A protein has these predicted regions:
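Eukaryotic partner-binding/assembly regions in large regulatory complexes
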Residues: 1-53
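Positively charged, polyanion-binding regions of nucleic-acid-associated proteins
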Residues: 1-16, 78-94
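Short acidic, hydrophobic short linear motifs in intrinsically disordered regions
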Residues: 17-26, 93-105
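Short loop/turn and capping residues at structural boundaries
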Residues: 23, 50-51, 101, 113-114, ...
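Short amphipathic alpha-helical interaction segments
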Residues: 29-38, 106-119
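Charged low-complexity interaction tracts in eukaryotic proteins
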Residues: 40-80, 119-130
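Phospho-regulated, low-complexity intrinsically disordered regions of nuclear gene-regulatory
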Residues: 60-92, 100, 105-112, 116
Length: 130
């Protein structure tokens, strides 16, 4: 059975972001894979905040100079995931960046992603304590 991607396109153009249950409702399908096939066909982005549970069309975000876009307190990044976003900010910071600075910038807890990046040897860590 073929599902009409216009239902998803219309929903997302109207409210800008949606969750998987909302997208399933728009398509009239309970199948997760049907939603993801439709999103892939349309081109989409996943939120870095809220554990990636929000979706938008790739054409919708208007990213700021930092590569971030927020809609109704849901964060999206050019990099996509929180892990990739955190790594970019660390990599681009000449003097490094603290977890607190990243938290303030991204409005989400970044300690877990920073630990994962460190354990994977993708970032270094310095103790700034006196």
């Amino acid at each position: 059975m073929e599902f009409d991607p216009d239902a998803v396109r219309s929903l997302l153009r109207g409210q800008q972001i949606a969750t998987l249950p909302e997208l399933k409702g728009a398509l009239g399908s309970s199948a997760t894979m049907t939603v993801f096939r439709t999103l892939k066909r349309l081109g989409y982005r996943t939120s870095y905040s809220h554990r990636g549970k929000y979706y938008t069309l790739a054409e919708i975000p208007r990213f700021d100079a930092r590569g971030l876009w927020t809609c109704r307190a849901v964060g999206f990044s050019r990099e996509g995931t929180l892990l990739a976003t955190a790594q970019r900010f660390v990599d681009e910071a000449d003097a490094g960046v603290t977890a607190g600075e990243l938290h303030e910038l991204l409005s989400v807890d970044v300690k877990g992603p920073l630990v994962r990046l460190y354990r994977r040897r993708r970032i270094d860590r310095e103790d700034l304590g006196g």
